[in-house]
Amino acid sequence: MEASDGQADEREEPLEQGTNARSLERRSSTTPAKDSLVRHAKGLDRDTFKICKEYLRPLKKFLRKLHLPKDLPQKKKLKYMKQSLVVLGDHINTFLQHYCRAWEIKHWKKMLWRFVSLFSELEAKQLRKLYKYTKNNQTTKFLMAFCPLDAPESSLLADQEDSLPKLCTAWGLRSHLNGMKERLSKLQAPGHPARLLKELRARGPRRRGSKLPQEPKLKRRRIKEAPDTPETCL
């Protein structure tokens, strides 16, 4: 119990003055940060930069995957981006829990994500949002935030055609396979995903309690019965 209490006290020390922060600075002093990165690190002084660099050093592989070749398929980009953000975001949260006091959390969260953004074309706020969407399984919001409007996402749908025959057979819809393939090809047409994203952005989130527009009710017309003619009476 005494050992665990000691560890808890150690974790509660403020980062700027705590022993953990000083040890991080001492270890990072042996490997000075590259001037090119420091120059682009707006709001990060050298000491803060060294602390962030030292703490995230074990995750170099995931930092590199935030900036992937442009010719890489979109599906793989999404996969690597999600994996990297989950690992990096969880690591940052661990840092905030174990090394920061309550009043320091906001500052160091901002600094650590700003350091991560140096390895990506996206800003720190965007990366934090993508991490949040990934953790909450909000795929639609993730795609809207990550995929640019002019980038067709046909590669994300390409593998769906392979699974169509199996699905149709399992559900007894073999005769509808051609029709489903035709609809899928329309979805994969150039510009179609971009148009869908534009429509989603234009609509925006629907407020709670808001009702969907209803079609005007048509007035029922009373049909007057025709008077009986002499022929019908016979």
Curated annotation (Swiss-Prot):
SMART domains: DUF4208. It comes from Bos taurus. Pfam families: CHD1-like_C. It comes from the Eukaryota. The keyword Cytoplasm applies. Keywords: Cytoplasm, Nucleus. The keyword tRNA processing does not apply. One of its GO terms (cellular component) is cytoplasm. The CHD1 helical C-terminal domain (CHCT) may bind DNA and nucleosomes. This is CHD1 helical C-terminal domain containing protein 1. Residues 44-145 are annotated as: CHD1 helical C-terminal domain (CHCT). May play a role in regulation of apoptosis. Coiled coil: none annotated. It is found in: Cytoplasm; Nucleus. Residues 1-38, 200-234 are annotated as: Disordered.
